[in-house]
Amino acid sequence: MGVRMWLPFPMLLLSALPATLLSGAAGFTPSLDSDFTFTLPAGQKECFYQPMPLKASLEIEYQVLDGGELDIDFHLASPEGRTLVFEQRKSDGVHTVETEDGDYMFCFDNTFSTISEKVIFFELILDNMGEEVEGQEDWKKYITNTDVLEMKLEDILESINSIKSRLSKSGHIQTLLRAFEARDRNIQESNFDRVNFWSVVNLMVMVVVSAIQVYTLKSLFEDKRKSRT
């Protein structure tokens, strides 16, 4: 039996805004992301469930960081149970879908492996375009004709959204770089152990062969004739 896990819907609290503008703050959080790293034992399958709103963009990226041949089976299903993505023996993948209202299921399957456990990293990015537009419209309710400001609320909203988008992209890139670094480090450590092991084996073989050669040469020059009395 596989293990099932529910992922909480990420929340962002904006405490620096006035209370009258909190309803428009939703325009600042169109993108929500989270990442997770776990170990999947050999012969096991683990599934995760993510509740999604209507007409959002869900991006799932996964990587096998360590274990065996760095491969895993991946399955993504819609709330109705329809298979959207099914991949076998993949080391990484990126998939984007336009979501419906409901719980999306994605599973990592390691049942084909009888020995090697896998260390798996995955990241979820949800871009809710509907809430972004609605939040921007809410901001306009608080703009009156008597407001004479050098920078309007629309400009503030645009600047904050631009900053947030750039920060989110930077965080996403840093997360991926950490995942790549972890996988490369695991590969290098595995190669290091293999090189050391075979180096020791070769050294032992060389010592044994050298000893045999010395013994053979020594035996060739020994005088085996018996002396007569």
From Swiss-Prot:
Signal peptide annotation: 1-27
Any one of the GO BP annotations: Golgi ribbon formation
Coiled coil residues, start to end: none
Topology in membrane: Single-pass type I membrane protein
Compartments, record wording: Endoplasmic reticulum membrane; Golgi apparatus, cis-Golgi network membrane; Endoplasmic reticulum-Golgi intermediate compartment membrane
UniProt entry tagged with the keyword Isomerase: no
GOLD domain span: 45-126
Cytoplasmic side: 218-229
Keyword Transmembrane attributed: yes
Keywords, alphabetical: Endoplasmic reticulum, Golgi apparatus, Membrane, Protein transport, Signal, Transmembrane, Transmembrane helix, Transport
Lumenal side: 28-196
InterPro entries listed in its UniProt record: Emp24-like (IPR015720), GOLD_dom (IPR009038), GOLD_dom_sf (IPR036598)
GO CC term (a single one): COPII-coated ER to Golgi transport vesicle
Family, per entry: Belongs to the EMP24/GP25L family.
Role played: Potential role in vesicular protein trafficking, mainly in the early secretory pathway. Required for the maintenance of the Golgi apparatus; involved in protein exchange between Golgi stacks during assembly. Probably not required for COPI-vesicle-mediated retrograde transport.
Subunit description: Interacts with TMED9 and TMED10.
The protein's name in its UniProt record: Transmembrane emp24 domain-containing protein 5
Species annotation: Rattus norvegicus (Rat)
